[in-house]
Amino acid sequence: MPVVIQADKSDLRQGPVMVTVEYQIIPERKADFLDLIHQYERIRRRDGASEWGIFYDTEAGDRYVEVFLVSSWAEHQRQHERQTQADHDLEQRLVSYIAGPPQVRHLIYAQAKE
């Protein structure tokens, strides 16, 4: 599930970075999904996320969006390196509750020029 995007080295200090992961859940697995995604919060925070949340789409009740913030692009790249086997196993269980691959987006804070 991790999506590693190569950034130009000059961009590594940019931040903060908001990562969104959109899940289309299997409706009958909703309770299992929510239980597991809240366990995943601990992993995100351990690996550097300062904020974390899971939200559902009011127009499409089986669509959930995980959102977390990290301090910089470099810190987000390090998150991928910190994944343990236990994290991977939990992630595989999470994937079994969704229909199709999650959609990951990376948004870097847009600063005004001084």
Indicate where each model-derived feature is located.
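An amphipathic, aromatic/His-enriched active-site/gating alpha helix that lines ligand/cofactor pockets
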Residues: 42-51, 69-105
